[in-house]
């Protein structure tokens, strides 16, 4: 039997007790199930209040039945919703009644999967449903809603259309050599290619912000021993997460703390103090710290503002320069302002990094500057009309598309190889297609939808 033609059923509301609970059905038996359970033929898109009965006519519950005939439904199939009381026992009895009339229990995400397979939404929109449900902040929810409404997909579709136009031009020139089109002399190909690369870069940047809002930003606190790193972690966490002493090298290993700032998730990593040491255990801690720095979304480089070397903090640890991300991802924290007498402030430096002067010992003003700065790094200041949600797999696909475009451009400019450019353009289009599901393996679809809630 084709499983897509089976009628599926699941409880669509959250587990636990509540005022209302919903059982959702999708498939060819939806109308028949409505008749058998309610005792009446349901008018499409009308609310029918009445009893829900078992196979012997006994009342299981009372509530509202709604029938949506396909293709004008969420899944594109006939859909029935039974809205009753939100007790788990009542809902389970109602679900078992649906199984009695011929339904099977739905797999996690199967309703959204059917909507995707029936072209009611694309893969990015389907994933946005889960992102909206799991959103941990109002900004993340707004971004997920915009993706659900198709904003991310429209951006990807626009890039795909531009790639198709470029492929047509390039492949036509290859297939009809008598036209003698010189790709480089013509200039049209490079112009179109650079325009696509520019727009792709913009989408990558916005998708990166969307992924941070969804998954949380990894913030690594780094610096010399006794710079106040652990004190800063404790202030951000709002509790004594790390041991703080005056003994240099107290923190010898990675310490992770998951926190929220106004609902926005951050994964804060405290690290061992960066210094040369003969202590084997501490040396391992320093190596782990440098590794964490290289993997961070944001690095907080903490310096003791009372130390003589604080005037040139990036010279404190030469290996830090090799491990740190883009300078724009480094925030310099000049700590212990209460001792140095420096003014609490935030400054934007010429090389792209931000400097915040504060005291990690109860300086509310400086700590609020840091919190606001971290929210800004995650895209908190986006307007309701900008941004969209994205996942790591989307970022990987965008990166692959960008790499193919870069490689294709190099093949064209260095070797004049139009055939190789055409292949890179095809690969870039394929990578973008994986975002919306235009090109997706069954294994990928299975992994994505299996992570959804049952009933979604």
From Swiss-Prot:
Binding site for GTP: 226-231, 245-251, 270-273, 335-338
Transmembrane feature ranges: none
Positions that bind (6S)-5-formyl-5,6,7,8-tetrahydrofolate: 24, 81, 120, 456
Gene3D superfamilies: P-loop containing nucleotide triphosphate hydrolases, Probable tRNA modification gtpase trme, domain 1, tRNA modification GTPase MnmE domain 2
One GO CC term, this protein: cytosol
E.C. code: 3.6.-.-
Lineage top rank: taxon: Bacteria
EC category: hydrolase
Record PANTHER family: TRNA MODIFICATION GTPASE GTPBP3 (PTHR42714), TRNA MODIFICATION GTPASE GTPBP3, MITOCHONDRIAL (PTHR42714:SF2)
Stated family: Belongs to the TRAFAC class TrmE-Era-EngA-EngB-Septin-like GTPase superfamily. TrmE GTPase family.
Name of the molecule in the record: tRNA modification GTPase MnmE
Organism expressing this protein natively: Pseudomonas putida (strain ATCC 47054 / DSM 6125 / CFBP 8728 / NCIMB 11950 / KT2440)
Gene: mnmE
